[in-house]
């Protein structure tokens, strides 16, 4: 089921993402991005123009996505309600507890982060990252 959901969601996300966004996308790799950077630098030199790059390292990126913000983004980019509903159900009612050297905490609701290891997570992260830029 997740594979089907991912394929449908990816169709919409691909429409929203610019071509230069290569992370977690089929047929796009690091070498392509390095080549694009080299070409940009070369053209800037030819035209005697300055060029600036900004590289962002998203530390703990998958852990930081707020679910409520994600639902708003999905609505804003017009992801169909039936897909959004399936995603919301997937994330609904998640709870966790933390084990420390002093014992275990009580159970609490998880309101942030995408599911680790889930095939939907990179797609959801890309959409969120593009939205905040």
Provide a role label for each language-model segment.
Residues 1-132:
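Conserved pre-catalytic core of RNA-dependent polymerases
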């Amino acid at each position: 089921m997740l594979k089907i959901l991912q394929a449908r969601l990816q169709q919409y996300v691909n429409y929203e993402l610019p071509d230069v966004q290569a992370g977690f996308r089929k047929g796009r790799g690091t070498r392509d991005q390095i080549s694009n950077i080299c070409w940009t630098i070369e053209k800037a030199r030819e035209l005697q123009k300055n060029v600036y790059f900004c590289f962002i390292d998203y530390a703990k990126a998958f852990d930081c996505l707020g679910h409520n913000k994600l639902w708003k983004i999905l609505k804003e980019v017009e992801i169909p309600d039936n897909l959004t509903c399936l995603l919301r159900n997937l994330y609904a009612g998640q709870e966790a507890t933390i084990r420390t050297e002093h014992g275990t905490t009580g159970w609490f609701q998880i309101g942030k982060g995408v599911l680790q290891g889930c095939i939907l997570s990179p797609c959801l992260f890309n959409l969120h990252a593009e939205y905040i830029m």
